[in-house]
């Protein structure tokens, strides 16, 4: 079975949450010493990305926590010869719960991992680490992509436009004020993203207690 692409994951996330309140999100630097476990159901970094805001979990970790030169944090579970340990390949979603489960919208952690330790084959394994600087995430939802998580990060503007860019073929986001969000579609897109109307999009509104998908057009 072919795994879903990043475009398909974002589309599925939007479709599954139309009419529902989504959590606001946050990412805060913390220094955590305890054992951590891979989260079951978290999404890995896309294979091919451009390094800019919202594109992958690793770029969020590097930008927010300034971990450009980090290596994979895990010290107790030896990777086999020939693996990519100790490369910092992905931002790994972690929890203190041995079963790998996180309550919807609950707290999770993001730390540097190699792909070998980030594999689902390591689910349930306690990871020890001497490096402690990482991000504590709030509002993360199971199966969420970096695109939708980053779209709900704090902003002075009240709305977010998620759209499938016809040039790059990727989901991207742009923050909107209230006037832009209620404008006719043609003006909304030209003002917010300077391109003609994309084939797929969603408009999210921050209502204080979370975000609400107020409009969407999907394939």
Name each model-derived stretch:
Residues 100-108, 120-160, 164:
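Polybasic, low-complexity binding patches
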Residues 4, 17-20, 46, 54, ...:
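Long, charged interaction segments in nuclear RNA/chromatin-associated proteins
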Residues 128, 154-219:
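C-terminal, well-folded lobe of enzymatic/effector domains
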């Amino acid at each position: 079975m072919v795994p879903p692409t990043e475009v398909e994951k974002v589309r599925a996330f939007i479709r599954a949450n139309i009419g529902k309140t989504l959590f606001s999100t946050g990412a805060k630097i913390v220094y955590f010493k305890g054992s951590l476990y891979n989260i079951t159901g978290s999404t890995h970094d896309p294979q091919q990305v451009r390094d800019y805001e919202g594109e992958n979990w690793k770029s969020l970790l590097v930008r927010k926590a300034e971990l450009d030169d980090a290596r994979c944090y895990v010290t107790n579970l030896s990777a086999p010869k020939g693996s990519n340990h100790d490369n910092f390949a992905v931002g790994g979603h972690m929890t203190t719960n041995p079963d790998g489960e996180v309550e919807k919208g609950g707290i999770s952690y993001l730390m540097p991992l190699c792909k070998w330790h980030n594999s689902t084959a390591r689910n349930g394994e306690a990871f020890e680490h001497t490096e402690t600087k990482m991000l504590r995430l709030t509002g993360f939802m199971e199966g969420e992509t970096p695109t939708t998580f980053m779209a709900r990060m704090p902003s002075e503007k009240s709305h977010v436009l998620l759209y499938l860019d016809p040039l790059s073929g990727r989901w991207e986001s742009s923050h909107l004020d209230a006037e832009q969000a209620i404008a006719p579609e043609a003006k909304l897109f030209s003002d917010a993203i300077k391109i003609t109307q994309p084939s797929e999009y969603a408009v999210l509104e921050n209502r204080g207690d979370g975000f609400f998908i107020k409009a969407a057009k999907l394939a």
